[in-house]
A protein has these predicted regions:
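Catalytic cores of Mg2+-dependent Asp-rich isoprenoid enzymes
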Residues: 1-12, 18, 22-155
Length: 155
């Protein structure tokens, strides 16, 4: 369960890193792997240019895929929490649903490295959160919620 908890944290952290790349670059920060950027012949400043952002797209997609792998493990962690601990299950499920919706918005964006404002999730996933409060006791229903959101992510 401890290793699953680590993946839970990595899923959310990697989502934040991927969502915040443009803003971080504007403030002189870059949390993408420097070694992998260098292998592509890129530095952080190159990502500010459309050509550099386009060349970094495979790395960005790979990191999105890695985040999804961590989300899969994080859901196993969440579903392992006893059903009677519904508050704890919701405390885990909601960030995961929001994170998956954020990844879906990032993959749907034509140039997530070039956005000027942070990507926000639309209202529909928020309704999914509300519904999850009624199905928190069911592993099948929570897993179905996650699967519906995950199915919208094209990596």
């Amino acid at each position: 369960m401890s290793e699953q908890g680590v993946s839970f944290g990595k899923a959310l952290q990697l989502t934040n890193v991927l969502r915040d790349v443009p803003g971080d670059l504007a403030h002189g920060r870059c949390y993408l792997p420097a070694r992998e950027l260098a292998a592509l012949g890129l530095g952080p400043r190159d990502l500010l240019e459309p050509a550099g952002a386009a060349r970094a797209r495979p790395l960005y997609r790979r990191l999105l895929g890695l985040a999804l792998e961590h989300y899969d493990v994080a859901w196993d962690y969440t579903l392992a929490i006893p059903r009677r601990e519904w508050r704890m299950r919701l405390a885990c499920a909601w960030p995961l649903l929001i994170g998956l919706a954020t990844l879906a918005a990032l993959t749907a964006h034509p140039n997530p490295l070039g956005v000027t404002a942070p990507v926000k999730i639309p209202a529909a996933p928020c309704a999914l959160l509300a519904r999850s409060a009624f199905t928190v006791w069911s592993n099948r229903a929570l897993a179905a919620h996650a699967a519906r959101v995950r199915a919208t992510i094209a990596v």
